[in-house]
């Protein structure tokens, strides 16, 4: 019997702005999932939150993209959104981009990470959930976990990991994916994933047997909705131990609070701060971007746990550095590199400002006109 782990999240409304999920909305979602468990649709579940995002962690035997499981999640979000509206919570139902369910929640707003696995004798997993950032935020940590021996010594000293891992990288603008193997193709891999707004690691497999090791939600809300409706706040499932990164190696990848896009109004770079459940809320400048990690064991579809992975003084220095970096970045105000690059601002007010001012721009004959970027050329010409 194969077990499917599904992590589905959505911003359905939050208390005091983009701050924290209200417990009454979690209770509403719990009723829906409890009913689904009684009916045998799901085997087990756990509900949590990161900032303003409601997180549903479910196990079942129905495979990925199952209609009944996704409908259960959709109904849970809809019921939670109703409560949010009754309470007058901010941005109630923000991530629910459609009024009706159509088979699965892909493209409807919620973020989805799922993996169908053959359970090992012991199946430890870590589930990472971020707020105020986008899927590419996991590119650097995933590279560290599965391709960097300075982070993961198991790549060197564990015979079952020595063959390396391959990365499925998605071009979110073109909807195309490429598989790149490490260590053989790490330079090509880095050339792509170093542009995380466009190239996102979606899945990681072990080279020797194609064992699925990690999966990331890749929904870009602005690309789905055609306008800014909030950041994507990605989730990620990582399998651990027994020929995969140890828990400590997976967590080590987040010891450096690297800069990620998102933060205030989804338009600023800031440090990704790993936090405990009690600190998984947006505060300063609607952030800084937060990361919650929960650890489980999965046994016959049952979720054993969780444990709060970043609730430990070992990450105090990471958080301290994140606060220093946050302060440094904030002092740039509305200037780059704190503010995102123009291509990432096209779903904010910037296009409206340019439209308003277009008649006031005058041609200057003695000024050299810069060439288009390589990405602008690609998008104007398309692929053959």
UniProtKB/Swiss-Prot annotation:
Effect of residue 131 to A: 2-fold increase in FBP affinity and 10-fold decrease in FBPase catalytic activity, leading to a 5.5-fold decrease in FBPase catalytic efficiency
EC number of this enzyme: 3.1.3.11, 4.1.2.13
Catalytic residues of the enzyme: 11 (proton acceptor), 228 (proton donor/acceptor), 231 (schiff-base intermediate with dhap)
Consequence of substituting residue 52 to A: 175-fold decrease in FBPase catalytic efficiency
InterPro entries: FBPase_V (IPR002803), FBPase_V_sf (IPR036076)
Residues that bind Mg(2+) 3: 231-233
Chain positions recorded as dihydroxyacetone phosphate binding sites: 18, 132, 265, 286
Annotated positions binding beta-D-fructose 1,6-bisphosphate: 18, 90, 103-104, 132, 241-242, 265, 286, 347
Keywords in alphabetical order: Carbohydrate metabolism, Gluconeogenesis, Hydrolase, Lyase, Magnesium, Metal-binding, Schiff base
Pathway(s) per entry: Carbohydrate biosynthesis; gluconeogenesis
Catalysis: reaction(s): beta-D-fructose 1,6-bisphosphate + H2O = beta-D-fructose 6-phosphate + phosphate; beta-D-fructose 1,6-bisphosphate = D-glyceraldehyde 3-phosphate + dihydroxyacetone phosphate
A Pfam family reported for this protein in Swiss-Prot or TrEMBL: FBPase_3
GO biological process: dephosphorylation; gluconeogenesis; NADPH regeneration
GO MF: fructose 1,6-bisphosphate 1-phosphatase activity; fructose-bisphosphate aldolase activity; magnesium ion binding
Mutagenesis or variant effect for residue 232 to A: 275-fold decrease in FBPase catalytic activity
Family designation: Belongs to the FBP aldolase/phosphatase family.
Record text on subunit structure and interactions: Homooctamer; dimer of tetramers.
Function: Catalyzes two subsequent steps in gluconeogenesis: the aldol condensation of dihydroxyacetone phosphate (DHAP) and glyceraldehyde-3-phosphate (GA3P) to fructose-1,6-bisphosphate (FBP), and the dephosphorylation of FBP to fructose-6-phosphate (F6P).
Record-linked HAMAP family: FBP_aldolase_phosphatase (MF_02067)
Name the UniProt record assigns to this protein: Fructose-1,6-bisphosphate aldolase/phosphatase
Organism: Sulfurisphaera tokodaii (strain DSM 16993 / JCM 10545 / NBRC 100140 / 7)
Native organism taxonomy: Archaea, Thermoproteota, Thermoprotei, Sulfolobales, Sulfolobaceae
């Amino acid at each position: 019997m194969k077990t499917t782990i599904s992590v589905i999240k959505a911003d359905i409304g939050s208390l005091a702005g983009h701050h924290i999920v209200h417990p009454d909305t979690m209770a509403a979602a719990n009723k829906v999932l409890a009913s689904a468990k009684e009916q045998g649709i799901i085997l087990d579940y756990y509900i949590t939150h990161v900032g303003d995002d409601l997180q549903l962690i479910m196990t079942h035997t129905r495979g990925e993209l199952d209609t009944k499981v996704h409908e259960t999640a959709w109904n849970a979000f809809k019921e939670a959104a109703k409560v949010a509206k009754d309470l007058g919570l901010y941005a109630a139902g923000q991530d629910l981009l459609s009024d009706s369910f159509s088979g699965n929640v892909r493209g409807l707003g919620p973020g989805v990470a799922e993996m169908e696995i053959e359970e090992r004798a012991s199946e430890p997993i870590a589930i990472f959930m971020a707020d105020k950032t986008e899927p590419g935020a996991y590119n650097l940590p995933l590279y560290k976990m599965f391709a960097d021996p300075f982070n993961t010594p198991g790549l060197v000293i564990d015979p079952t990991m020595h063959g390396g891992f391959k990365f499925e990288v998605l071009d979110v603008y073109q909807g195309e994916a490429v598989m790149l193997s490490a260590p053989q193709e790490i330079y090509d891999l880095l050339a792509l994933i170093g542009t995380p707004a466009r190239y996102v690691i979606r899945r990681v497999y072990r080279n020797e047997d194609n064992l699925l090791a990690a999966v990331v939600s890749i929904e870009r809300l602005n690309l789905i909705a055609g306008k800014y409706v909030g950041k994507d706040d990605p989730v990620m499932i990582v399998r651990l131990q027994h020929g995969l990164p140890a828990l400590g190696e997976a967590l080590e990848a987040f010891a450096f609070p690297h800069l990620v896009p998102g933060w205030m109004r989804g338009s600023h770079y800031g440090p990704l701060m790993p936090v405990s459940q009690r600190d998984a809320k947006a505060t300063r400048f609607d952030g800084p971007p937060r990361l919650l990690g929960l650890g489980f064991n999965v046994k016959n579809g049952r979720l054993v746990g969780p444990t709060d992975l970043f609730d430990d003084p070992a990450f105090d220095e990471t958080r301290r550095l994140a606060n220093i970096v946050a302060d440094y970045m904030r002092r740039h105000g509305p200037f780059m590199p704190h503010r995102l690059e123009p291509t990432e601002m096209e779903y904010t007010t910037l296009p409206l400002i340019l439209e308003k001012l277009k008649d006031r721009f005058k041609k200057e004959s003695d000024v050299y006109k810069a060439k288009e970027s390589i990405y602008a050329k690609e998008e104007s010409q398309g692929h053959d």
